[in-house]
Amino acid sequence: MGQELSQHELYVEQLKKALKTRGVKVKGNDLLKFFDFVKDTCPWFPQEGTIDIKRWRRVGDCFQDYYNTFGPEKIPVTAFSYWNLIKDLIDKKEADPQVMAAVTQTEKILKVSSQTDLRDNSHNKDMDLISLESDDEEAKAPSEKMTMSNKSPKKYPAMLASQNNNTDKDPDLSEVDWDGLEDEAAKYHNPDWPPFLSRPPPYNRTAATAPAVMAVVNPKEELKEKISQLEEQIKLEELHQSLIIRLQKLKTGNERVTSSGNIESHSRTPKWPGQCLPKGKYLINKNTEEYPPKDIFPVTETMDGQGQAWRHHNGFDFTVIKELKTAVSQYGATAPYTLAIVESIADNWLTPTDWNTLVRAVLSGGDHLIWKSEFFENCRDTAKRNQQAGNGWDFDMLTGSGNYANTDAQMQYDPGLFAQIQAAATNAWRKLPVKGDPGASLTGVKQGPDEPFADFVHRLITTAGRIFGNAEAGVDYVKQLAYENANPACQAAIRPYRKKTDLTGYIRLCSDIGPSYQQGLAMAAAFSGQTVKDLLNNKNKDRGGCFKCGKKGHFAKDCRDHSNKNPESKVPGLCPRCKRGKHWANECKSKTDSQGNPLPPHQGNGMRGQPQAPKQAYGAVSFVPANSNNPFQNLIEPPQEVQDWTSVPPPTQY
């Protein structure tokens, strides 16, 4: 015991030093208690004698199970902390020489102690594993313990003594006086006696025995035994599944009986160069395969680790079927985009049942019947060529009818037969009639009110490519639709340059038109009481032409277009000036009215300016005598006198 304690103290000191190098200080007593707890919860740990990260994680799992079972009261507080610290040391033992030395020393001590425990267990197989002695008795000398072991046990001494005595004093049953015993027993059944207040406890003469000693089992040996059993079970299951697959192939006639007895080495290989097999999404576990598979899935073939080929069904991707259905509805069954999806699906191994199910799901009833008739016709032509070639692939195999109506039989077809079915199905699809207007879906692509013009053009080009196969073929049509299906703001920006630039020019012109531009147009239209479209049309209207005819190059007074005269002009009535004749008053030239009275002359322009002040000369004025013979003198007023100089200032206002 002292040697074991010294060894424990030795590797505890090693661990303390290793933890100290990492800046962690721990107490030696706490580590000793921790390893005692490890030994109690994980008795296998000292026996294996190896410390690595895998075994140390097993110790952590044991701690967690112990915690879940007995609760936090039964586990030391520092148990998980020390476990994490030692885990970090084990993870980095390669980089630290001191930690490596501590782990190596601990493994040696564990191996020595485990060997000592095994030798002690082999010599003392009948030793009681549960000690009934107290902790104080364990501290006594070994001599005292030997003396105490020779004494009788302290617990239940009377029962054990009676048991030992009775084993020697049991009488022979043949010598018992049974009549006397019955008379004595009858005395204990007197009805006049009062009943017992309580039944006496049953007397158990068997002494409490210690639990049996369990033999120490090496966990490595037990694990190896379980692994060998599992490997044997896996081999038998693989053999069983391979026999089932081979039996199905023999029933369908796709496998020839060979003299080779190695069933696991059988695998299907390509029969001609360049032939490729469809790849499955993952390797299927043969233990979980379901037979028979569902009847609506394409066939895939995978290879396991031993080279064995396994065929199974994987489900159609729902997004692919949805995309094909959408393409058929929007662009038509024979559009290039739709045919591209069909060809991508046909790259897999599809049985005739798979093709029939797929076509029925995405095409209308009439188109499905047309496809089926074309498919059968193609299969008849292919079957005739196969008959001439002598490969045995007849009409029933190509169409999945007759003896090959079951999907299990179709699943075992050769790759060449799958290729013939693919060609017949895709050729039948290409012969479907064109319905409706292919450009109807293209004209339905319109720009949203807040959608950028570049995104709208991209949608337009994508749709045109799916309909025409090549967007360059309908570039003029796309350019026209880019203007007609654009929103009013983009149309107003493109209109002046519509015939002067191409589609890229349209994109440049509308690159700045965004939500803020649309908001400004809406506000301007609201203030002007117009719609956005009317506002943009009036804004771009040219006002530089003739007001009379609207043409450029002349004014209204020079316009020679007499066809635009207003036919609804008023006819002048009776002249208000002369009261005779129908003409306008400003055009009246009469001197008298209808009564013969003279009419005043016209007053010129009819506009009179500001009256002027009388003109008067100040200062010396020369006098000209009046001459009656002057023809220009028509004044009657008397002649003015000669004015002298005056000091009167001129008038301030006229």
From Swiss-Prot:
Taxonomic lineage of the native organism: Viruses, Riboviria, Pararnavirae, Artverviricota, Revtraviricetes
Protein name per Swiss-Prot or TrEMBL: Gag polyprotein
Gene: gag
Propeptide: 101-152
PANTHER family: ENDOGENOUS RETROVIRUS GROUP K MEMBER 24 GAG POLYPROTEIN-RELATED (PTHR40389), IGE-BINDING PROTEIN (PTHR40389:SF3)
Lipid addition sites, N-myristoyl glycine: 2
Keywords: Capsid protein, Coiled coil, Host-virus interaction, Lipoprotein, Metal-binding, Myristate, Phosphoprotein, Repeat, Viral budding, Viral budding via the host ESCRT complexes, Viral matrix protein, Viral nucleoprotein, Viral release from host cell, Virion, Zinc, Zinc-finger
PROSITE patterns recorded: ZF_CCHC
Cystines in this chain: none
Species, as recorded: Simian retrovirus SRV-2
MF GO annotations: nucleic acid binding; structural constituent of virion; zinc ion binding
Cellular component, GO annotation: viral nucleocapsid
UniProt entry tagged with the keyword Metal-binding: yes
